[in-house]
Design a protein with these regions (language model features):
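Rossmann-like NAD(P)(H) cofactor-binding subdomain of soluble oxidoreductases
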Residues: 1-44
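Glycine-rich beta-alpha junction loops
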Residues: 10, 33-39, 62, 92, ...
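Internal alpha-helical scaffold of NAD(P)-dependent oxidoreductase catalytic cores
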Residues: 48-138
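Interdomain hinge/lid region at the active-site interface
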Residues: 122-192
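Long, positively charged, glycine-interspersed low-complexity recognition regions
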Residues: 193-209
């Protein structure tokens, strides 16, 4: 029997699995994380295409061959439902997700909370923000009950990402009237060029389908 999970952080989960399964952890547990969440929860929001093209990370204990035995069979099943799979060290995974998943959630939450403080219940004014505002605050509706545990189990990486973003925002704030602002836009445009256009595309060295 193989046990797996779909949690957003992996280091603490793997450590707990080692405590539970001991020397058998490599054969009994496979840590997984599908990058295909939604801001809504519950069966009424189920989506049959949720995993189509989505990245699905797997992290192993030291020396575990995740593509062999029951782990390999499960990964083949994940690929069969349309997800793109990749193996990644747990610590590397948690740092990456702090930047590409957890930080965006905190940005959306902070922006939405700031708008409530600034404009309260003045919905007509907020609706004037249009598509940009809706896109930036879409995941602000995500449940705290889920994100509480993510923040607790990845707090060091998330704090580091938040600190670096704070420094970046401070730099922008101090350079609204200088050439530095244009350079920030140039960096942002470069990211748009290198980020995969389709959901779930992974570097060939990491991906397996």
């Amino acid at each position: 029997t193989l046990l797996t999970d779909v949690g957003s952080t992996k280091a603490e989960v793997l450590a707990a699995a080692v405590r539970v399964f001991g020397k058998d952890v490599r054969e009994r547990f496979l840590a997984g994380h599908p990058m295909a969440g939604k801001e809504q929860c519950g069966m009424e929001h189920a989506d049959p295409d949720l995993f189509q093209g989505a990245a699905w990370f797997f992290s192993s204990s030291n020396g575990q061959d995740i593509y062999g035995g029951l782990s390999g069979e499960f990964i083949e099943l994940v690929s069969a439902i349309g997800a793109r799979t990749a193996g990644m060290d747990a610590a590397e995974h948690d740092k990456l997700c702090a930047w590409i998943s957890h930080l965006p959630q905190m940005i959306s939450t902070a922006l939405a909370a700031a708008l409530v403080d600034e404009y309260g219940e003045q919905a007509p004014l907020l609706e004037a923000g249009g598509r940009a505002l809706r896109e930036m605050t879409r995941i602000a509706g995500s449940p705290y009950s889920m994100w509480r545990d993510i923040a607790l189990t990845n707090k060091d990486n998330l704090r580091d990402a938040l600190l670096k973003l704070e420094q970046r925002l401070a730099h922008i704030r101090e350079n609204l009237d200088t050439r530095e602002l244009a350079m920030e836009f140039e960096k942002a445009h470069h990211l748009k060029k290198i980020v995969p256009r389709k959901r779930g595309e992974l570097p060939k060295s990491q991906s397996r389908k």
